């Protein structure tokens, strides 16, 4: 069985085709990386946004290249940069740029006002960094930056899955949902009361799944829900092995280890991954 994977990163978009051998191991048939190159120049030093539609176009071209060369691919897996969001309308169309995880609108000092991230920490007792999707969304609500036609939001790789399959409503894996902030990784749900306190209409929240599910099909191949890039890198490098440290250096960097129980502490984040991927 052959499968293709697409990783939409901040600076590059990568893909791979794997074949499962008789011994159960995966053999890499081909890997390919192209530049993302879709950042939008704005007049705001704190703003880090990208052309979402151009990113998807480049990702589709890469995927189509693989499907033409390896026609027996049966499944398509997705991953990519976490935390950032795009807005979608009722038809599942993207109606905004990608507000990336590097965006700093949540950390802006405006006169005597404290930054949004500090307000969230004081009012909700939640640590949510600038660049987290719901921090971005709250800022956009307050500054009338949410597109009029938007009804929900998701990550760029979730939107890519919607684009491929024609899905109209986002379905987000828990590994990506947690990256938006305001998410209880122990109970596996958004903290809706705290979001409502911050002025968020919780009807905008995307649907969340705890397992990798089928989104639909693209050119006759099954497309599954995207997972977070941290979880995907751990899966690819360490599988489900415990007592292994994974050092991942991309645009950002993390050290991760698998844990059978939920744990939180200063500088440590528990990210759901079947069990827990503890990331620092």
Language model regions located:
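N-terminal glycine/serine-rich phosphate-binding loop of ATP-dependent small-molecule kinases
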Residues: 1-96, 122, 149, 206-207, ...
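Gly/Ser/Thr-rich active-site cleft segment
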Residues: 8-10, 121-230
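Conserved donor sugar-nucleotide recognition element shared by glycan-biosynthetic enzymes
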Residues: 55, 59, 106, 133, ...
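A generic secondary-structure signal
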Residues: 61-69, 139-143, 237
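Residue-level signal for inorganic ion chemistry
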Residues: 76, 103, 140
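Residues that line or immediately flank small-molecule/substrate-binding pockets and catalytic motifs
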Residues: 80, 102, 212
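Glycine-rich phosphate-binding loop of actin/hexokinase-like ATP-binding domains
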Residues: 85-90, 94-111, 150, 154-190, ...
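Conserved FAD-binding subdomain of flavin-dependent enzymes
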Residues: 114-120
């Amino acid at each position: 069985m052959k499968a293709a994977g697409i990783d939409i990163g901040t600076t590059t978009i990568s893909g791979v085709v794997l074949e499962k051998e008789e011994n159960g191991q995966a053999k890499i048939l081909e890997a390919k990386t192209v530049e993302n190159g879709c950042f939008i120049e704005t007049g705001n030093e704190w703003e880090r946004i990208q052309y979402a539609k151009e990113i998807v176009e480049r990702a589709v071209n890469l995927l189509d290249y693989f499907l033409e060369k390896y026609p027996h691919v049966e499944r398509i897996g997705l991953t990519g940069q976490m935390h950032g969001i795009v807005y979608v309308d009722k038809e599942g169309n993207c109606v905004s740029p990608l507000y990336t995880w590097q965006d700093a609108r949540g950390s802006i000092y405006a006169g005597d006002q404290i930054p949004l991230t500090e307000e969230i920490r004081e009012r909700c007792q939640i640590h949510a960094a600038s660049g987290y999707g719901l921090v971005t969304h709250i800022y956009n609500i307050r500054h009338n930056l949410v597109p009029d036609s938007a009804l929900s939001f998701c990550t760029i790789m979730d939107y890519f899955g919607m684009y491929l399959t024609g899905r109209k409503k986002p379905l987000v894996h828990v590994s990506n949902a947690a990256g938006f902030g305001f998410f209880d990784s122990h109970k596996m749900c958004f903290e809706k009361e705290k979001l409502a306190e911050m002025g968020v209409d919780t009807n905008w929240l995307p649907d969340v799944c705890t397992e990798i599910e089928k989104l639909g099909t693209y050119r006759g191949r099954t497309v599954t829900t995207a997972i977070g890039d941290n979880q995907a890198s751990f899966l690819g490098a360490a599988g489900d092995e415990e007592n292994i440290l994974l050092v991942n250096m991309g645009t950002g960097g993390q050290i991760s280890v698998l844990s059978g129980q939920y744990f939180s502490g200063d500088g440590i984040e528990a990210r759901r991954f079947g069990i827990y991927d503890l990331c620092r």
